Amino acid sequence: MFGYVVVNEQNSIVFLDGNEEFKTIFQSLIQSEITSRKSDLDSASSGVGSSTCTEEQESSLDHFKKPNVVFNSSEISHILLPLILLYRSTSEKTKDPITEMSSQFGTISISKFYHNYLVLVFANDDRKRIEVSQTIEHTIATLFGPLIAFCHTDLTTVKKPKEHLACALTRKLSYSPKC
């Protein structure tokens, strides 16, 4: 799995991409979150539980379909918010931020740059994680500079830098280390 997320100082996602495995894993996390919320609401609303047999059949069919994942940044930020807040609170409280964290999906590296923006890189390969993190930081600083606060908008002055950043990171995503 390999992917990256760039978060601004308001904890909103401004850039996000990854390989198919990354997209599929996050899509399944979103689906499980939605399903668990729905079942919580169903069971709490009337006191009468409902059968989930049809939902299970539908979800098992989804595994056989080719994933066409479109990310909704608010859904992803909902999943990543605890990790982001843990990083920010630890770095404020102890002045010794968490830089890497292991999960069942691989290692997550977190780095802070330019006006409290965070870069989260998800990958199993250490070299790839460091390389992509540095590429993101340098490319954003070079392309956006003081306009970084506007990178999530559709202003004409940030459209080209956003396209260039997407191209540079797509090249990094398609790179596979030689064994």
Swiss-Prot record:
Residue segments, region Disordered: 40-59
Compositionally biased region (Polar residues): 42-54
Name this protein carries in UniProt: Gut granule loss protein 3
Gene symbol of the encoding locus: glo-3
